[in-house]
Amino acid sequence: MKYLQDRASAINPLDEFNELIKSKKTLRIKLGVDPTAPDVTLGWYAVLRALRKFQEYGHTAVLILGEFTAQVGDPSGKSETRSQLATDEITKHSRGVLPIIENILMKENLEIVSNKDWLSKLKSSELVNLASSTTLAQMLEREDFSNRYAKNSPISLMEFFYPLFQGYDSVAVKADIEIGGHDQLWNLMLGREIQKFYSMTPQVAMTFPLLVGTDGTKKMSQSFDNYISITDTPENIYGKVMSIPDEVMWEYFTMLTDLDLLEIAEFKKSIQENGENPFNTKKLLGKLIVSELYSDNEARSAEISFQNITINKNTPDDLQIFTIDKTDQVHLPKILTENGIT
């Protein structure tokens, strides 16, 4: 459990967390993911790794596919209302990410459910009851809502319902601990209050740092196009990891590898104080990530490929060469189609 505690950005309340761990009972660890995009990024993978760690400690992972909440749109960190996604688009994304997630998590001690199974069936009276669990003043305690309200920026009532629905998910699955990115802390804490409202023992909120994207500034997101897909080729994953700013790689070491934090600190010290080339340390990071997602052999091959093509500027071994008849007018789309590149 030390691995998770060392990496968590918040554990709230800590005393209740410690009591749960001491109880030795099998805990229900909730993680909700909204299938709003077709891919699983390293950002998602970081928190999915944390969920798997709980499984390895003998606890039950409860993975909620937010097929209902994805229609509402998570307002966390947003300065304006999110565009609503069509149901069929959400279903398509869900079918795409589910097998990837299943490959990350252990098959034992795993429950995967969709929140549309209960949220879509709530009656009007039940929605009114849920809404009565929280006040407008509580909602405006959220920094993003508060900022938008102060600037007279529109906030739809639908957005207020998102954290209510997320909290109700905790009621539905009887969560003992809910984990998520640090931007979810307010939502997770509201989940505690909603569980209390329904006369349940409140969950503990446990958040982890948000992984920064390849641009080195914004959180990794498919909407920002600064992400690394875990289903990308080993060569591409390795190359993209090598492209991240040096100062960002420590977050990647912390959230995406099993290295001890003291060992990571030593790497950082060697660069800052002893003049060690950060390039060499980042190569290790790339190998560790690719090795976990694929294999040690694939990681070595990706490193060699990066060295040959990116550093030494050699021609790739799998480079395809096509002959074009110069007497004909060149029509690029046709050439690509004929050679199976489209």
Which ranges hold each PLM region?
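Short, hydrophobic/aliphatic alpha-helical segments
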Residues: K24-G32, A61, Y162-A172, P278-T281
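N-terminal catalytic cores of NTP/NDP-binding nucleotidyl/phosphoryl-transfer enzymes
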Residues: I11-D74, I179-L185, G191
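A charged helix-plus-loop insertion that forms the helical arch/lid used to bind
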Residues: P75-T91
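Short, conserved acidic/polar surface loops in the N-terminal third of protein domains
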Residues: V72-G77, K123-S125
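N-terminal regions that are enriched for targeting/export leaders
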Residues: M1-I11
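Divalent-metal (Mg2+/Mn2+/Ca2+)-assisted nucleotide/phosphate chemistry catalytic cores
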Residues: A8, A86-F208, G216
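Short, hinge-like loop/turn segments at secondary-structure boundaries
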Residues: K78-S83, V128-S132, F224
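Conserved nucleotide- and phosphate/pyrophosphate-binding catalytic cores
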Residues: I194-T342
